[in-house]
Amino acid sequence: MAQTVQNVTLSLTLPITCHICLGKVRQPVICINNHVFCSICIDLWLKNNSQCPACRVPITPENPCKEIIGGTSESEPMLSHTVRKHLRKTRLELLHKEYEDEIDCLQKEVEELKSKNLSLESQIKTILDPLTLVQGNQNEDKHLVTDNPSKINPETVAEWKKKLRTANEIYEKVKDDVDKLKEANKKLKLENGGLVRENLRLKAEVDNRSPQKFGRFAVAALQSKVEQYERETNRLKKALERSDKYIEELESQVAQLKNSSEEKEAMNSICQTALSADGKGSKGSEEDVVSKNQGDSARKQPGSSTSSSSHLAKPSSSRLCDTSSARQESTSKADLNCSKNKDLYQEQVEVMLDVTDTSMDTYLEREWGNKPSDCVPYKDEELYDLPAPCTPLSLSCLQLSTPENRESSVVQAGGSKKHSNHLRKLVFDDFCDSSNVSNKDSSEDDISRSENEKKSECFSSPKTGFWDCCSTSYAQNLDFESSEGNTIANSVGEISSKLSEKSGLCLSKRLNSIRSFEMNRTRTSSEASMDAAYLDKISELDSMMSESDNSKSPCNNGFKSLDLDGLSKSSQGSEFLEEPDKLEEKTELNLSKGSLTNDQLENGSEWKPTSFFLLSPSDQEMNEDFSLHSSSCPVTNEIKPPSCLFQTEFSQGILLSSSHRLFEDQRFGSSLFKMSSEMHSLHNHLQSPWSTSFVPEKRNKNVNQSTKRKIQSSLSSASPSKATKS
């Protein structure tokens, strides 16, 4: 039966069209996969191919295409009408039975599903609403009771009520517990969130506080410090090496200076023995010249003086050794020319040369501290301790400020002579002449030592005691000394013809040596940079203060005329080289005019101001005050307080000379009194631009009538910055 149903279903569900001709199927044929073809079409296809045209399944005799029985075919008309009727009837009956069976099965399934649905609905109701369930149960019980009143007992009802009560109580308790648990759950959730946040915070704090976080930064900082310390140590090592080299150089220079000093002492002893005879022969002639020219020098100058005092020339052997000998010998020379008792003064000078263990400052305090009446302080006097570079410009100037310099203009205008009652100490603005400066000049002393020893014979005075004590190491600064000798008009004695001829020859040789020495003088780059920085800083203040002083000072008018006199004398240098006889005569005339009287020299207890002018070739005047004091008592052979007041005006060119030259010029000034103005003008003409010329003081009244000056003006006039710029 089932097989017939499948066949019927198959025949009814076959496609109507053929896969090959795409037309209505005639005599349907199927392959293994139930693909329908027309029998004619499939026969034609199988002639060329052995596969199904739809699924490509091989069609072989073992698996041929099958014909469908009962399908629409051309053979149907061959059956009779009755046969076809019975076929249709049987076919419909089969379909009817099949459908009826299927309907019955479906009805059974629906009933089962309904019963299952009802049971599920009842379960849902009991779960969601137990009261309804109880009520439903009661209703059922009632129905049962009503239905079966004889079967229900009151005991069972009471039991069910008790159970119901207990169930309700349990339900209420469980409900309360659930609410409490919900609240506790909420609290726990909040606490959990707080703890999570606290945990995160603690983790972050631990990360921040961990020493490993900043470990690499600390290591880098320590490494940088170590590198910095290494660089510092290397720099200090280099500095120590440089200092060691410098110390070795200084020690070598000290050894050279010791050797040179020993040689100088030997040469001085030789010169002393050689010149003793000439000094005795010229003693009488010097005293005659002194008495002859006493009146002229007294009128032209309010007072005359010599070089620095003997008691000021006692520095220690470790500092200013060359300067000490220079100033001591200058003092001995000046006092020897002005004193009558030569032997007594010569012994005094020997004592001065032996005493070298007392510094200048302590000695000045000892000498001047014993005279409180003379040492009157002045309110305008100040000490300026300027930083001096390690150059020959360290000692810039000497200054002496006394009330007499400011008050004597009124007295001297009326022609009266007022003697000073105020004794002032020397003011050293840049007195930093230490062993460094002496070591720098030691090479210069060694270079010119041989020439200086020859020069001592040319410029020596007839008095032997003076030149015996003079050191020749500073004769190299003749460019400044010769010009100074032209202005200081207090030398005594005459020059013999032999000495004048020797002086002319030695002067020409000395000028050439000095020029070559000045040109070969070099300075290191470090010293030059220090000087440049030092000079540039002071140049501005110096220019402003010098302009204000030059505009106010009445001495400016007298400077130009004196400078013209010095320049006019420079043109006479050629005559000096060609006519040595005329040179001797002019030298004697100049010395006779500038000599001092014995009365003025013996008056050692009084102060007499004397003015000197140093004018630069560029006619730029600057003013600087300082005093050099020296006096000696020929009777008691004791060193007395100074008896002379020097007021010296420095120009720009003088400040370019080394710090030693300032004292060397003072030493050699008295020995060079014998040189004529033509010799100095020629010397200045041949010298380097740094050298200057001295011009005698002819307008002393104009200088003394100047108003009170400030200490700043003296600093500006002696500033090394302007001298360098000039």
UniProtKB/Swiss-Prot annotation:
EC code(s) of this entry: 2.3.2.27
CDD domains to which the protein is assigned, alphabetical: RING-HC_RNF219
Record GO terms (molecular function): chromatin binding; ubiquitin-protein transferase activity; zinc ion binding
SUPFAM superfamilies per record: RING/U-box
Phosphoserine modification, residue list: S210, S526, S553, S561, S568, S570, S719, S721
Keyword Transmembrane helix tagged: no
Keywords, comma-separated and alphabetical: Chromosome, Coiled coil, Metal-binding, Phosphoprotein, Transferase, Ubl conjugation, Ubl conjugation pathway, Zinc, Zinc-finger
ZnF locations on chain (RING-type): 18-56
Basic and acidic residues: bias regions: 280-290, 446-457, 579-588
Catalytic activity: S-ubiquitinyl-[E2 ubiquitin-conjugating enzyme]-L-cysteine + [acceptor protein]-L-lysine = [E2 ubiquitin-conjugating enzyme]-L-cysteine + N(6)-ubiquitinyl-[acceptor protein]-L-lysine
Amino-acid biosynthesis found in the keyword field: no
Cellular component GO terms held in the UniProt record: chromatin
Localisation: Chromosome
Ranges of biased composition (kind: Low complexity): 304-318, 713-726
Compositional bias per record (Polar residues), positions renumbered to this chain: 319-334, 589-602
PTM characteristics: Auto-ubiquitinated.
Coiled-coil regions listed: 87-129, 155-270
Gene Ontology biological process terms from the UniProt entry: protein autoubiquitination; protein monoubiquitination; regulation of DNA replication
Oligomer and partners: Associates with ORC complex. Binds to chromatin; association is cell cycle-regulated, absent from mitotic chromosomes, is associated with chromatin from G1 and partially released from chromatin from mid S-phase.
Stated role: E3 ubiquitin ligase essential for DNA replication origin activation during S phase. Acts as a replication origin selector which selects the origins to be fired and catalyzes the multi-mono-ubiquitination of a subset of chromatin-bound ORC3 and ORC5 during S-phase.
Name recorded for this polypeptide: ORC ubiquitin ligase 1
Lineage: Eukaryota, Metazoa, Chordata, Craniata, Vertebrata
Gene, per the UniProt record: OBI1
